[in-house]
Amino acid sequence: MGNPENIEDAYVAVIRPKNAASLNSREYRAKSYEILLHEVPIEGQKKKRKKVLLETKLQGNSEITQGISDYVVETTEPISPANQGIRGKRVVLMKTFPLEGEKVGREAALFIVPSVVKDNTKYTYTPGCPIFYCLQDIMRVCSESSTHFATLTARMLIALDKWLDERHTQSHFIPALFRPSPLERIKTNVINPAYATESGQAENSLHMGYSALEIKSKMLALEKADTCIYNPLFGSDLQYTNRVDKVVINPYFGLGAPDYSKIQIPKQEQWQRSRSSVTEDKERQWVDDFPLHRSACEGDSELLNRLLNERFSVNQLDSDHWAPIHYACWYGKVEATRILLEKGKCNPNLLNGQLSSPLHFAAGGGHAEIVQILLNHPEIDRHITDQQGRSPLNICEENKQNNWEEAAKLLKEAINKPYEKVRIYRMDGSYRSVELKHGNNTTVQQIMEGMRLSQETQQYFTIWICSENLSLQLKPYHKPLQHVRDWPEILAELTNLDPQRETPQLFLRRDVRLPLEVEKKIEDPLAILILFDEARYNLLKGFYTAPDAKLITLASLLLQIVYGNYESKKHKQGFLNEENLKSIVPITKLKSKAPHWTNRILHEYKNLSTSEGVSKEMHHLQRMFLQNCWEIPTYGAAFFTGQIFTKASPSNHKVIPVYVGVNIKGLHLLNMETKALLISLKYGCFMWQLGDADSCFQIHSMENKMSFIVHTKQAGLVVKLLVKLNGQLMPMERNS
């Protein structure tokens, strides 16, 4: 616990699991827990509030764990039924934290108090009293710079989240953490003479003594045993001996080490019985390890619904590499299949270890109703084939099981039905609807072929999946619709964003790997238009940081492209109002500089319109715009989000949210709020290293010997892209 003399403040994290099943999981999920937090007003801001952990002072002359336990009970009495308070299982010291400011040199301790599993008990809301919050919701918005939390509370919550993640990997730790305390287990044992009927019961109210029949009835009520068997010999004077069916003596015992050259493998009939017993053990183990698979196999809808509510995964493969939906389709369990697809959101094209799909199993078994359910699913791949290249129709006609004629008819009719479509947007807001011939199995490569672009143009672009604050380039073999389905999980893995506010869409965008030397040779007007739309979008959003003169030139080119040639009567001084400036000037310059640029923009616009040496054809103007953008350091970059820490004073650090841009030129950091370019490093002039758990990466500039660390969940993606793009460059390009 460190030096107790330095510890005054005790912070308490009261946590409870939402369900008992999560305690046995080796995978940590923050959404499986709730945490007790206070809300207090922010100083000087009456309406705004921040969340803090429970806090108390440690009394040097008292027993610490008992004091904290009593404090939790006292604090939670107003919100609990009958003012009983919340009595934790135990008090565990997690970590100590150094204090800052006036309390430098002292420490605060974070104690964890595990509570009972969440039940239907209604806790009343009382102003000024703590309430339970979902831990996942808290961690999504928790950072040391967040105004929603006290700084020390934020640090402690982040440490708690990491601590729980680590402890879930340790066998039996989490169940032991939430196990009733030894004193509670003794008091609630019915054979204890001082049996407590309720937890927290006062010692003077304990019932003293039970008869054997009363103990039996209590045990039946508490343990819910199917049968209760008395030992008839217990307490009697009868003599008894152990009865055995057979005694086998090892004839080789005591004869020394055997001659292994003479050992023979027994015949198969001699070990057949032993092998069958092993099979039985495996079957019993399968039932215990995969309850969702068993309920799907048996068509137990009630159990299936309950397990899905407890967040059992529909994608988990068992020891035979089958998912629950494979069993439901194999055994013809119609309702189980429907529940897994609708409630469990199971992928209808999920493959087992032998690359067979649910549709293969349903068709092979002649389960026409399940075939119909699968074919009606918008993401189904009607043309899916197994490891031997067989379609569901081939399997159906080979096996001829049950109602196979109806199943075959449905499969044949489905081939000619119109396909579902997906919208692929461009950066100007337009889109093309592309047929999904393989449902959610349709790959990026297949979608690109459906975009009706020439083979040459296709190589410059690819599909991106983007929401408001996260954009990812997909690879040719990726399946975009499955990424759309999994977007909440992807967001949770790579960001702290709220998935409810991030709606993913698919975009046709420039391939970040496209070399500038190749782009400069592009002549196709459609390719130039798509590149122009994306460059214009990034310019207006402030991602292209450049000198004022460059931004004014780009603005004049946009005026020529949008409004045509300059007309003195039409394009007067007042023409460039705030609304028109929005379409030609970066948002970061709109209020600070744009009003002072209007004369210079109009002047360049006029010169451009009257210049005879400049072609006024649209794709030539768009190419001129791109030529000016090529000189900007961040052109063509993929942007990630992160944080860097700078020293605001000797005692504390300032957190700066940043965009991390990676392109064919190098790495660039932009201030997230102002879009100011903080640093720009070319390949060959800096080194990088991925941090622990892919949570950060370190950059070292070889020119000015400067090093800094960027903290981001996207660190792994950033480093992979740096390695990829740096590897594309020739040594001469890297050093130029």
UniProtKB/Swiss-Prot annotation:
Location(s), subcellular: Cytoplasm, Cytoskeleton; Cell membrane; Cell junction
Primary localization class, coarse: cytoplasm
Name of the molecule in the record: Krev interaction trapped protein 1
GO CC field: cell-cell junction; cytoplasm; cytoskeleton; plasma membrane
SMART domains: ANK (SM00248), B41 (SM00295)
A Pfam cross-reference name: Ank_KRIT1
Domain notes: The FERM domain mediates binding to RAP1A and RAP1B and is necessary for binding to phosphatidylinositol 4,5-bisphosphate (PIP2). The N-terminal domain has structural similarity to the nudix hydrolase domain, despite the absence of a nudix box and low sequence similarity with nudix hydrolase domains. The N-terminus and the C-terminus part associate together via the NPAY binding motif and adopt a lose conformation that is disrupted by ITGB1BP1, but not by RAP1A.
Region (Interaction with RAP1B), start-end ranges: 430-452
Keyword check for DNA damage: no
UniProt keyword annotations, A-Z: Angiogenesis, ANK repeat, Cell junction, Cell membrane, Cytoplasm, Cytoskeleton, Membrane, Repeat
Membrane topology: Peripheral membrane protein
InterPro entries: Ankyrin_rpt, Ankyrin_rpt-contain_sf, ARM_KRIT1, Band_41_domain, FERM/acyl-CoA-bd_prot_sf, FERM_2, FERM_central, FERM_domain
Span list, region Interaction with ITGB1BP1: 172-195
Protein's GO biological process: angiogenesis; cell redox homeostasis; negative regulation of angiogenesis; negative regulation of endothelial cell apoptotic process; negative regulation of endothelial cell migration; negative regulation of endothelial cell proliferation; regulation of establishment of cell polarity
GO molecular function: microtubule binding; phosphatidylinositol-4,5-bisphosphate binding
